[in-house]
Amino acid sequence: MVYPVKMKISPKIISQIYYQILRIRKIESKISKEYSEWKIRCPVHLSIGQESIAAPLSILFKNKKYEVLSSHRAHAHYLGKGGNLFKLISEIMGKSTGCSGGRGGSMHLIDKDVGFLLSTAIVANSIPVAAGVALSKKIKKEKGLALAFFGDGAIEEGVFYETINFSIIKNLPIIFICENNKYSVYSKMEVRQPKDRKIHKMVEKIGIKSLFSNGLNAIEIYQKYLHAKKYVEKKNKPIFLEFNTYRYLEHCGPFNDDNLKYRPKKEIDFWKKNDPLIVLEKKYNKILNKKKIDYFNKKISNEINLSFNKAKRSKYPKSSTKEKEIYA
C-alpha cells in the first residue's frame, strides 16, 4: 500500500530543501568538472538528478542521534546530513584533511561528528550495518534511529531480506531508504526483476510498513521522511521507503553515457524535464523567486570555491601514518 501524507509546508522549509538540492547539484557538477580535467583521480559515483532524496536530511535528521549509513553513491547523503564540504573534497582528493583522513576516498566516507557512520563500496553493505546500529540503540536505550541508504540493485542481495526480517522481529529503530534509479549499472529493472514488480509492495508483504514517492517532488519526499521519522520513534518499528529517481550521468564517472544506448533518449529527456529544481521552481515560484535563487547560487558558488581551493592547498597523509586508525 502507498500511504498518503498530506500536510502544509512552510515557505522556510521549501526554501531550505531547494537550497540543499541546488547546493548538492552545484557541488557534484564541480566535482564532475574537476574529475574530467584530471584534477581528481578517485573514482566518483555522482548523484546529479537524485539530490531531492538527500536534501531533507538537513532539516529532519541533522542531529547526531540520527545516524546515516550509505552506499558508493554517498556525496549527497553526506552533504545532506551536515557533512563539511571542505572535508568531502579533501577526502576525494586524498588529502589528510579529508573526513576519512584521505584514506577512504569517495566511496568510504565517515564523519562521526555529524552522525555519518559510513559509506561503502560493497552493494547492500550499509543495510546490515545499519541494523546493527539500530540494535545497539535499542539495547542501550538510546534516542534516535539509523538510516540505511541503498540502490535498487541492493534488493537483489540476500542480506537485504535477512536484515529486513531481523529488523521486523526485533522492532529496530531504522529507516530503510531505497533510491530506485531504475538501473544497476547498465541493467534495467525489467531484466533483473519480474515484470511490473513494485519494490515497496514486495517488501511490504514481508511485514514492514512501506512508503513510496515518485521522486519528482522533493516536498513529497520530505513529507514521507517526516511520516517515517514519527512512525519509527512512536511505534518503535522499522519502516521502508522507496523513492523513484534518476541519475543523469554515467554509473561511475563525470560524463554522460547517452552514446551507450542502454537508456532510451525519451526516458532521459522525461526526467530532465521534470528535474527536482525545475519542479520546485514552477510549483513554488512566488517563494523561489529569481532574487532568492540568484542569492543561493552566489552563496553556494563562494562556498565551493573556498572549499576546493583550501583542499588543493592541503597536504597528503604522511607515509608514517599509514597504519593509523586501521581496524581489523
Which role fits each region the language model picked out?
Residues 116-313:
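Glycine-rich ThDP/TPP pyrophosphate-binding loop and its adjacent helix/strand module
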Residues 78-80, 186, 251, 321:
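Short acidic, gly/pro-rich beta-turn/loop elements at beta-sheet edges
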Residues 2, 107-109, 212-215, 238, ...:
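Generic preference for hydrophobic/aromatic residues in regular secondary structure cores
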Residues 1-54, 243, 251-328:
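Conserved acidic/glycine
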Residues 29-32, 39-170, 188-195, 200, ...:
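Cofactor-binding active-site loop characterized by glycine-rich and histidine/acidic residues
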